[in-house]
UniProtKB/Swiss-Prot annotation:
Protein name in UniProt: T-cell leukemia/lymphoma protein 1B
Biological process according to GO: intracellular signal transduction
The keyword rRNA processing is assigned to this record: no
Taxonomic source organism: Homo sapiens
Disulfide links within the chain: none
GO molecular function: protein kinase binding; protein serine/threonine kinase activator activity
Pfam assignment, any one: TCL1_MTCP1
Length: 128
């Protein structure tokens, strides 16, 4: 029973492919679910301030490695998945390179209760 409750942490997944909005699969066939997407500044603040601006918000994504059942899936309109990449490839220096060539830093790779968690942060280049 102890082995079921503990998560064996090693290196982060080498690659994550989108399966459905908010759902990714790694090279070992494990499912990763997007549980938090945070924009800084918030999407509302960004919309107010961005008229005529090219500034992009930073994005932080929390992914949990967990089994997914079809009936539990959220529709794509329920969470802001449209700004997440279709593919993340592990890159040297604790970061992922996305399909659009953007870089996402690994802010955390650890355990929350019995779930393996991967936290990625995108910091856009300032275009002032």
């Amino acid at each position: 029973m102890a082995s079921e409750a503990s998560v064996r942490l090693g290196v982060p997944p080498g690659r994550l492919w989108i399966q459905r909005p908010g759902i990714y699969e790694d090279e070992e066939g494990r499912t990763w679910v997007t549980v938090v997407v945070r924009f800084n500044p918030s999407r509302r603040e960004w919309a107010r301030a961005s008229q005529g601006s090219r500034y992009e918000p930073s994005i932080t994504v929390h992914l949990w490695q967990m089994a997914v059942h079809t009936r539990e899936l959220l529709s794509s309109g329920q969470m802001p998945f449209s700004q997440l990449p279709a593919v993340w490839q592990l890159y040297p220096g604790r970061k992922y390179r996305a399909a659009d060539s953007s870089f996402w830093e690994i802010a955390d790779h650890g355990q929350i209760d019995s779930m393996e968690q991967l936290v990625l942060t995108y910091q856009p280049e300032r275009k002032d």
